[in-house]
Amino acid sequence: MAAATALPGFGSVSSAPAKQIIPDAGVFAQTTIAGSVQGDSPSLYVPYTGTSAAAIIVAEGAAINESDTKPLELAIRTQKVAVLNVFANESGAQSAASNGNVGGSGIDVVGMLTDGMKKTIIDKANAILWQNPAPTEGKPETAPTGLFNYPGIIQGGNITNTLDPIVDAIASISTNGGAPTGLVMNYGVWAYLLKLRDAEGRLIISPDVANTPTPALFGLPVHLDGMAPDGKILVNSIGDVYSATGDINIARTDDRYFERDSFGVRLTFRFGWGVPYPDHLAVITINKK
């Protein structure tokens, strides 16, 4: 976890690179950062090529013919994630910096409060990264679509009692030119996979895999996130998911809640993502018996 962020002073606003404050967010672990965004509802435009022309062999001194590849542009839409909490001044006074920790225990209460707010930001950011709905047909895209719901993604079939659909999805992505980098799922899905048994009653996934702090299947790291949807697995290709992120903005007010002897703290974070080649990702469904 990132180190606790000190609260700014009266009515002030401070900013910090989001990767320093919330490094565990999925956007930093499972996408490629293409640029930064600031301001009100901005978009980032990332150039890429369509169907790439094949390279050719050319004799020394011979002319090299131009390819017919046309440049395209990926529009990365962004959304702002925010949280506003109000705390009693008694809580704000109990910080290690002011020598007023709880019962002399040395606990930095302000740090604990802001860490809780950062977790709220991470959870919401991860939830929309994975699960944002696709736009309604015929309507323009105003927010990025969650990777599990991304239009054009490979539908990798259903897992019932074998892991074959994962193998097939990896093969399909590779055939399409992608490079699978990991499997994203929630803890319930991972638990279901760990309990799968073959016809002779033996666990399909070795206990050694289950017990390692960094599990992997078929050479791909398993990225566990409680905000991933239930009953689904994403075969991700980090190099094919481009994202844009802004700073974490932290603001404090001691005036608005004056009559309550309280202060307010606000955290905001803007980010978005896009996938130029959706068939470089796959989603697999779990059919639980």
Show where each model-derived region lies:
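Alpha-helical scaffold segments that mediate packing/assembly in large oligomeric complexes
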Residues: 75, 80-172, 283-289
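Protruding loop/beta-arch "assembly-hinge" segments enriched in small, turn-prone residues
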Residues: 1-35, 252-289
